[in-house]
């Protein structure tokens, strides 16, 4: 959740004493069906680019979702994905995604999808993405551990696709000081909530950019899409290297 941020306090405060934190977070969450995304629409349209943005989405009932929205180069909402299951204490903030899940979008002849954070550890979610023919998998996350980049490399080899991992760089000094107990819970520049870990991985598992650790910045790479069919010649997990007569994925579709 890049906008308004990640609810890190759920790991530091008792759940019944975080009302002020939750209220601030909810008030700054994004109403996708309202006008909150209009500045993003205008920016994408002006620049002529597609944008995938991690957000906390607020619906009319008040529930919050950890979501990714896709905005096309005409400045229109092209799709949305809600995280299937929040992780651990995140469930005190975000609800389970129930529709607009496992969404993919086509950018020219490139199919893009996203799995958020530890959704990438859900084998069936990965298979569903492979079955949808994803070429580039976005993996925004709060996980900045040493194990995360090997996870992305495994997925890139398993799916023979590109994986773009996005991890925030946030420090204690980034937390608003007018929130209750903020000074006690968070330190200054040396208190790293997340050290970053953004990376880009090619089909087969080669790390082609990043990881960017210890500072804010932008990670970029040029994606050679010819590497996808070349890799799948040897291993196509939902094609010639599958056994649907033995193993199948039966998923529920939501309109």
Where are these regions (language model features)?
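C-terminal beta-strand edge segments of enzyme domains
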Residues: 104, 168-255
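Short Pro/Gly-enriched beta-strand edge/turn motifs at strand-loop
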Residues: 50-55, 83-89, 179-185
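Short beta->alpha transition motifs characteristic of CBS
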Residues: 3-9, 69, 81-87, 199, ...
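Active-site beta-strand/loop signature of hydrolases that rely on acidic residues for catalysis
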Residues: 1-14, 21-24, 44, 51-52, ...
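A short acidic, glycine-rich active-site loop
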Residues: 16-35, 186-193
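Short, compositionally biased leader-like segments
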Residues: 23-46, 148-178, 250-254
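Short, hinge-like loop/turn segments at secondary-structure boundaries
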Residues: 12-13, 68-73, 155-157, 180-184
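Active-site catalytic loop in hydrolytic enzyme cores
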Residues: 29-32, 37-42, 57-136, 141-154, ...
């Amino acid at each position: 959740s890049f906008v308004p941020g990640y609810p890190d306090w759920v790991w530091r405060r008792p759940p019944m004493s975080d009302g002020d934190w939750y209220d601030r977070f909810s008030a700054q969450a994004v109403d996708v069906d309202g006008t909150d995304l209009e500045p993003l629409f205008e920016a994408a349209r002006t620049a002529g680019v597609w944008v995938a943005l991690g957000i906390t989405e607020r619906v009319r009932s008040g529930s919050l979702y950890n979501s990714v929205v896709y905005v096309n180069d005409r400045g229109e909402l092209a799709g949305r994905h809600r995280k299937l299951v929040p992780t651990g204490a995140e469930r005190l903030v975000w609800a389970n995604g129930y529709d607009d899940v496992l969404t993919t979008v086509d950018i020219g002849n490139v199919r893009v999808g996203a799995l958020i954070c530890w959704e990438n550890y859900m084998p069936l979610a990965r298979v569903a993405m492979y079955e949808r023919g994803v070429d580039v998998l976005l993996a925004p996350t709060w996980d900045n551990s040493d194990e995360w980049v090997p996870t992305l490399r495994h997925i890139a080899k398993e799916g023979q696709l590109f994986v773009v991992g996005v991890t925030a760089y946030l420090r204690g000094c980034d937390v608003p000081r007018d929130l209750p107990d903020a000074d006690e819970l968070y330190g200054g520049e040396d208190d790293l909530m997340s050290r970053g870990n953004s990376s880009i991985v090619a089909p087969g598992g080669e790390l082609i950019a990043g990881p960017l650790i210890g500072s804010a910045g932008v990670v970029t790479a040029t994606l050679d899409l010819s590497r996808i069919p070349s890799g799948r010649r040897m291993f196509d997990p939902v094609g010639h290297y599958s056994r649907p007569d033995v193993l199948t994925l039966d998923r529920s579709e939501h309109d």
